[in-house]
A protein has these predicted regions:
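Extended, folded cores of ATP/NTP-driven motor/assembly subunits in large transport
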Residues: 1-285
Length: 285
């Protein structure tokens, strides 16, 4: 595989709402971060089956991208950074304890702690249960609960990354196709597991549930402008943007972003022909 720096495709578009139609959104996880999405291990790809028997979850996304028509552009962006455990100073912790109850909020925990708490609750090891509680002695986990515990423990055992996913569909009015929006928003459904899934962030989606929510259209115009600017700047983790990221581990990231295998082919996305050769004898080391 040869990796080269690609030209920034976002610089080729000057967004003008009078000439270009735009639809976009950000994605987040439906459940708490420790609950995993469906990964390549769940698809059985780690068993190294023959190419013709592989079911690569990224295939449907590539097929969709290959199906868009003339004058249409679909952008998909995944931003990551190494997850840092959330640390607070002592005085801030005490302040949060004071205001937590009246406002019904909760202090943010790091990813591993959150996952361990989920497991502890399911194992009846949290503070609400005492050691001499007869309920614990009679407690038997169901098969589904055991699988959930194993999945969460497997997820938090791997390095986590703060993640942001953003998608945009652009086209001139004559080429704008609503069915392309459906395909774009459905391109992450193959990662849905019994525990978690991707879902659009309503306040970051360029749409409103009812006309009365934006009668003049000014809020929608502002959302589109903001989403486009955030996309081209790869903005997300800075505090000023006030967007809560979620966490995916290395297994999950490798599932949603990887080089597609040779079995994934589409007529409109041809592969570059290449062959392996020995390195030149004068290659500096």
């Amino acid at each position: 595989v040869e990796v080269v720096e690609a030209e920034d495709y976002t610089k080729k578009i000057k967004y003008d709402p009078k000439e270009i139609e735009l639809f976009g959104s950000m994605f987040t996880l439906d459940e708490d971060d420790p609950y995993p999405i469906k990964t390549y291990i769940d698809y059985g790809l780690e068993a190294d089956p023959k190419e013709e028997f592989k079911i690569d979850p990224i295939a449907s996304t590539i097929e969709f991208l290959g199906s868009i028509g003339k004058g249409e552009q679909v952008w998909m962006q995944t931003l990551i950074r190494a997850h840092k455990k959330y640390k607070k100073k002592v005085f801030l912790e005490e302040l949060l304890k004071t205001i937590k109850k009246p406002f019904g909020g909760k202090s943010r925990k790091n990813w591993e702690e959150e996952g361990k708490e989920i497991v502890d609750v399911m194992m009846k090891r949290d503070e609400e249960y005492k050691e001499d509680d007869p309920k614990i002695k009679m407690f038997v986990q169901s098969k589904g609960e055991q699988q959930t515990i194993e999945s969460v423990e497997r997820a938090i055992s791997k390095p986590g990354f703060d993640t942001a996913i953003r998608v945009i569909y652009l086209a001139e009015e004559e080429y704008f196709d609503v069915s392309t929006i459906s395909g774009m928003m459905s391109s992450f459904k193959q990662y849905t597991s019994g525990l978690n899934r991707f879902k659009p962030v309503s306040k970051e989606t360029t749409d409103f549930d009812a006309p009365w929510m934006d009668p003049l259209g000014s809020r929608l115009a502002e959302r589109k402008r903001k989403l486009f600017n955030h996309y081209i700047r790869r903005a997300h983790f800075e505090t000023r943007h006030n967007i809560r990221d979620f966490i995916l581990n290395t297994e999950e990231l490798a599932t949603i972003f990887h080089f597609p295998p040779s079995v994934v082919e589409t007529p409109t996305l041809p592969r570059m022909e290449a062959k392996k050769v020995e390195p030149p004898p004068n290659l500096p080391l």
